[in-house]
């Protein structure tokens, strides 16, 4: 059952803290030379990104309120996609993924026309709108899934597209590292406990 508006930071898409997650795969965790994987690795990576993430906290909170999205999920995606703008994330003038994806949340230019500066409110708003579109697509594709599973499926779709989210059990099967939604959810849960 969904908690009230205030308990979920105004998020209407589900309750982040009630979503099950296995966290980062060993492949994803190896970015930081972690010998651990799973939720613990996701939490460590989120913790490592917190100082940089806090530079964008005001924007994240503003966009989250306007879009009725959990700010911790936005932070989780930013952490996964660009390590909150880290130099080591491979960003060059805001571009990553071999010049195909733009900004903190890596909007793919092959499917969307990137808006704003790479670290701007306009960019985070656009990327959050894309996420919401994918959550709604998963809600339509899988109407029998719980609201929280649809939320998690939308996060997977943000990475791989809704057509590549094929089942509840294989939600991450076609995502980068085969762990995108699980890793983002685990990072987001950490950010939720740390001010987001």
What are these regions (language model features)?
Residues 1-38, 46-54, 65-67, 98-99, ...:
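Non-catalytic cell-wall polysaccharide-engagement segments
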Residues 57-58:
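N-terminal post-signal-peptidase region of extra-cytosolic proteins
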Residues 61, 65-102:
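Secreted/periplasmic proteins that engage bacterial cell-wall peptidoglycan
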């Amino acid at each position: 059952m969904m908690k009230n508006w205030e308990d979920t930071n105004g998020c209407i898409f589900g309750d982040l803290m009630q979503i099950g997650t296995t966290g980062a795969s060993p492949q994803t965790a190896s970015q930081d030379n972690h010998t651990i994987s799973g939720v613990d690795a996701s939490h460590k990576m989120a913790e490592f990104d917190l100082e940089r993430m806090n530079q964008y906290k005001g924007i994240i909170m503003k966009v989250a309120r306007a879009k009725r999205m959990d700010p911790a999920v936005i932070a989780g995606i930013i952490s996964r996609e660009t390590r909150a703008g880290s130099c080591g994330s491979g960003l060059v003038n805001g571009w990553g993924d071999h010049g195909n994806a733009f900004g903190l949340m890596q909007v793919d230019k092959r499917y969307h026309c990137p808006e704003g500066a790479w670290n701007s409110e306009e960019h985070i708003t656009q990327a959050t709108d894309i996420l919401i579109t994918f959550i709604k697509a998963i809600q339509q594709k899988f109407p029998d899934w719980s609201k929280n599973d649809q939320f998690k499926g939308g996060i997977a779709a943000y990475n791989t597209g809704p057509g590549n989210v094929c089942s509840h059990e294989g939600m991450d099967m076609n995502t980068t590292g085969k762990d995108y939604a699980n890793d983002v959810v685990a990072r987001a849960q950490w950010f939720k406990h740390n001010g987001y």
